[in-house]
């Protein structure tokens, strides 16, 4: 909300040790007034939404859902620090759906995300969860036809999920009307700032009604995020995971010493049979490297698919569809894939390049062991990467061992 609020000191926050089976070692540092609601049935949700939640396959709310949904529904501004794989997307999606007046065919909630695929996934999740509610939801993203956006928005959408640039463009054109918006959700806010969306987020915010409720989700809370929460939020509730406790639990992490860049390719070829036991994602730091590696793998007769931010939207969507369905098993990608894209079968991640910043590490690796599934992460480490690897270990209080010969047995 528009008035500035200084965040309460952590002295007033209470540490809670969670007792859920797969969250045993995560400590939440959470505002005093946050209660735990152990079931969806006791959250006071509408019947048609509950049906959608259970039809989706959810049984019991995750730790973040048990704490955040009720607070958001109450209308409180909420800062939730939550890593990938904790059920954060469903947290705000369920809350948004609960707060809609379906009779009113105007945009009532706006969700901003850093990547096009993430916005589309949020939109699809909303439509699935809101299946029995007759909800209208549109993904407003760059790389798609502007005319189609205008047509969909004119038709009337209860919720718009999108990337900041295209959303702001639609607001400026007056196609996206903001007068009925009650809630703004900033998903993966840290990554939106990393991608230089800060100005556009502020631009969008200026067009919203002054009493708009703000929900911010972020894996990390750097200074710029806290500055934003001070500007946008009133007395926010905090639901935070202490940084040192962000869990990489259930994910076995290894490194392979490759000495030089040229040796990585042969190492990957040696591992290919292991990759295809399940589904694997291979991360490179640049689009050029993704294209180069994809071509080189195909020349060596290995089947791989690839994806990065320069590809046309349609192409990226069909690649994701193939990968989700299991038709393709090995995907080479940049970090565009690392944020929030949910493919349950992925249990192996390879960092062909170590990520450029340590926050990205948990986003990449967090893909491979979602909701307590076990996963394996393998990091290719050149001589001059050893320092970065040790830094990641220290930052996350974790251990990354040399890859054993029997790695296939661990997947």
UniProtKB/Swiss-Prot annotation:
<comment type="function">
    <text>ATP-dependent RNA helicase. Involved in pre-mRNA splicing as component of the spliceosome. Core component of the splicing-dependent multiprotein exon junction complex (EJC) deposited at splice junctions on mRNAs. The EJC is a dynamic structure consisting of core proteins and several peripheral nuclear and cytoplasmic associated factors that join the complex only transiently either during EJC assembly or during subsequent mRNA metabolism.</text>
</comment>
<feature type="cross-link" description="Glycyl lysine isopeptide (Lys-Gly) (interchain with G-Cter in SUMO2)">
    <location>
        <position position="374"/>
    </location>
</feature>
<feature type="binding site">
    <location>
        <position position="60"/>
    </location>
    <ligand>
        <name>ATP</name>
    </ligand>
</feature>
<feature type="binding site">
    <location>
        <begin position="367"/>
        <end position="371"/>
    </location>
    <ligand>
        <name>ATP</name>
    </ligand>
</feature>
<feature type="modified residue" description="N-acetylmethionine">
    <location>
        <position position="1"/>
    </location>
</feature>
<feature type="modified residue" description="N6-acetyllysine">
    <location>
        <position position="321"/>
    </location>
</feature>
<feature type="binding site">
    <location>
        <begin position="85"/>
        <end position="90"/>
    </location>
    <ligand>
        <name>ATP</name>
    </ligand>
</feature>
<keyword id="KW-0832">Ubl conjugation</keyword>
<dbReference type="InterPro" id="IPR014014">
    <property type="entry name" value="RNA_helicase_DEAD_Q_motif"/>
</dbReference>
<feature type="cross-link" description="Glycyl lysine isopeptide (Lys-Gly) (interchain with G-Cter in SUMO2)">
    <location>
        <position position="314"/>
    </location>
</feature>
<feature type="short sequence motif" description="DEAD box">
    <location>
        <begin position="187"/>
        <end position="190"/>
    </location>
</feature>
<feature type="modified residue" description="Phosphothreonine">
    <location>
        <position position="163"/>
    </location>
</feature>
<dbReference type="InterPro" id="IPR027417">
    <property type="entry name" value="P-loop_NTPase"/>
</dbReference>
<dbReference type="GO" id="GO:0005524">
    <property type="term" value="F:ATP binding"/>
</dbReference>
<dbReference type="GO" id="GO:0071006">
    <property type="term" value="C:U2-type catalytic step 1 spliceosome"/>
</dbReference>
<dbReference type="GO" id="GO:0000184">
    <property type="term" value="P:nuclear-transcribed mRNA catabolic process, nonsense-mediated decay"/>
</dbReference>
<dbReference type="GO" id="GO:0000381">
    <property type="term" value="P:regulation of alternative mRNA splicing, via spliceosome"/>
</dbReference>
<dbReference type="GO" id="GO:0003723">
    <property type="term" value="F:RNA binding"/>
</dbReference>
<dbReference type="GO" id="GO:0005634">
    <property type="term" value="C:nucleus"/>
</dbReference>
<keyword id="KW-0866">Nonsense-mediated mRNA decay</keyword>
<dbReference type="GO" id="GO:0006417">
    <property type="term" value="P:regulation of translation"/>
</dbReference>
<keyword id="KW-0508">mRNA splicing</keyword>
<feature type="domain" description="Helicase C-terminal">
    <location>
        <begin position="250"/>
        <end position="411"/>
    </location>
</feature>
<dbReference type="InterPro" id="IPR011545">
    <property type="entry name" value="DEAD/DEAH_box_helicase_dom"/>
</dbReference>
<keyword id="KW-0509">mRNA transport</keyword>
<keyword id="KW-0378">Hydrolase</keyword>
<keyword id="KW-0597">Phosphoprotein</keyword>
<dbReference type="Pfam" id="PF00271">
    <property type="entry name" value="Helicase_C"/>
</dbReference>
<dbReference type="GO" id="GO:0048701">
    <property type="term" value="P:embryonic cranial skeleton morphogenesis"/>
</dbReference>
<feature type="cross-link" description="Glycyl lysine isopeptide (Lys-Gly) (interchain with G-Cter in SUMO2)">
    <location>
        <position position="19"/>
    </location>
</feature>
<dbReference type="GO" id="GO:0016607">
    <property type="term" value="C:nuclear speck"/>
</dbReference>
<feature type="modified residue" description="N6-acetyllysine">
    <location>
        <position position="296"/>
    </location>
</feature>
<feature type="modified residue" description="N-acetylalanine; in Eukaryotic initiation factor 4A-III, N-terminally processed">
    <location>
        <position position="2"/>
    </location>
</feature>
<feature type="modified residue" description="N6-acetyllysine">
    <location>
        <position position="124"/>
    </location>
</feature>
<feature type="modified residue" description="N6-acetyllysine">
    <location>
        <position position="198"/>
    </location>
</feature>
<keyword id="KW-0007">Acetylation</keyword>
<dbReference type="InterPro" id="IPR001650">
    <property type="entry name" value="Helicase_C-like"/>
</dbReference>
<keyword id="KW-0698">rRNA processing</keyword>
<feature type="modified residue" description="Phosphoserine">
    <location>
        <position position="12"/>
    </location>
</feature>
<comment type="subunit">
    <text>Identified in the spliceosome C complex. Core component of the mRNA splicing-dependent exon junction complex (EJC); the core complex contains CASC3, EIF4A3, MAGOH or MAGOHB, and RBM8A. Interacts with CASC3, MAGOH, NXF1, RBM8A and ALYREF/THOC4. Component of the ALYREF/THOC4-EJC-RNA complex; in the complex interacts with MAGOH, RBM8A and THOC4 (via the WXHD motif); these interactions are likely specific to RNA-bound EJC. May interact with NOM1. Interacts with POLDIP3. Interacts with CWC22 and PRPF19 in an RNA-independent manner.</text>
</comment>
<feature type="binding site">
    <location>
        <position position="65"/>
    </location>
    <ligand>
        <name>ATP</name>
    </ligand>
</feature>
<dbReference type="GO" id="GO:0005737">
    <property type="term" value="C:cytoplasm"/>
</dbReference>
